Amino acid sequence: MVKESQENEIKSICNNTIIDPSLGEGRGGYLIGAATSNSGKTTFTMGLLRALRDRGLKVQPYKCGPDYIDTMFHEIASGRESVNLDTYMASDEHVKGVFKRYGEDADVRIVEGVMGLFDGYDKSKGSSAEIAMLLNIPVILVVNAKSVAYSVAPLIYGFKHFNPKLKIAGVVFNMVASENHFSFLKQACEDAGVPCLGYMLRNHDLIIPGRHLGLTIEAREETEELIGLAAKEVEEHVGWPLPPPSPVEREPIREREQIKEDKVSIGLSPSGSLPTEGSPMLITSEYVKSGGRGHLIAIAKDSAFNFTYRANIDALRELGEVIFFSPQSDERMPDCDLLYLPGGYPELFASDLANNASMRDSIKAFAERGGRIFAECGGFMYLCNDIDGIPMCGVFPFSATMMDAKLHLGYRQLAKDNCQLSIINSQLPKGHEFHYSSVIEPDTLPEGIRKEQFQLSAKGQAVDTALYHYKNVLAGYTHWYWAETGFAELLDLFKCKDTEA
């Protein structure tokens, strides 16, 4: 009776909600797409997430592609950690499994797309449209209506008919000037044969002012205000209810093949003690299967370092206990077997990081005595001598700089021919690069530092993105996705030819 009462309550809520009332285990969701970037899909997504949350629904957010910032917005709006879905960095089966796994207890899933709906790394490969079709969920298309009226009709018609396998649930217009303006847009939608779901008025307070929102308490308050305004727009101007989402078929989630018969190098001693430099650092597959109890994995997490994938962190939990710490405010790094320094914006908080000398010294000492460190992008910058003259950890004798900033952007994969594939049939890990900074190396690298350049772009072209080794420290600009391939396997594959393990 209690369960029936709860279901009736949900159905009552949904009678006036954007989501179909027939909720329950295994529900599907919607993908929020757009004709182009900067159409307002993030603003609409935040408003939709908050509006649904305010109605008492459990909403699981997702983000297409490798983006870290939008997932932070999602978490603030929904109260649930957002999950990335990327068909370049992971297989279709893995993406479907992640979509189902993290939304098991949700009433509805909302996926925010990336760029234009059909934009991918190779035509539409890896695009939002590809993910929507893979997951069998309909698309809510956000169209920027600034400076346009009835001319949106052929655009909408084209998106509806370009790929018949893609379901367009309807259109939401953004940057609408007035109700009269909306009347022209609504007529265009009807003539294009696509439902018009509503609109969001042109409001400069709804424009996201920068990509750094959500990183500080002050910025989070600003984000909360923006989300509240967006939710109000959704409540007032988006039609209720929307077409029902597609159900997710209940098929077993394929477990990733992280357990191998061979031993895999992870840089942790089976006893859980800190390995000394030069000692064998192997962990057996049986130990991984047992959960790696006794191993501590410390992850930097604060305003300066927060670019992580939820599925990656859960994969690390398979290897041991995960603990978080703040390089900005904690006195020193925690005792651990593996230190993970993810990306973020250390350049924005360089003074705070520099002022915490005890933390920097503890990380440098950990590296010097053979501690295992894995650092990506902003974490790599933190390990350099300095960021534009502001002192950092000094593990690598490099200077990180934002001077002459140039965007380095793109997917990355390992060059198979250059890597020692000690794990037979293992899927090569992939990742992405996104940064404006650069590192200035000395003319000659000091003894003990190795520089490896064995990464390719999504189209298989060699790139100069490097990976640096010092003792048991592995660092570089690429953000890697190991939730499918496994973190132990990732480190094992970084053993390259002509280098020592």
Predicted regions and their residues:
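Cysteine-nucleophile active-site neighborhood
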Residues: 346-419
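A short helix->loop->beta-strand "cap" motif at the edges of active sites that frequently abuts
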Residues: 137, 194, 368-372
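ATP-dependent carboxylate-amine ligase catalytic core
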Residues: 26-135, 143-169, 179-183
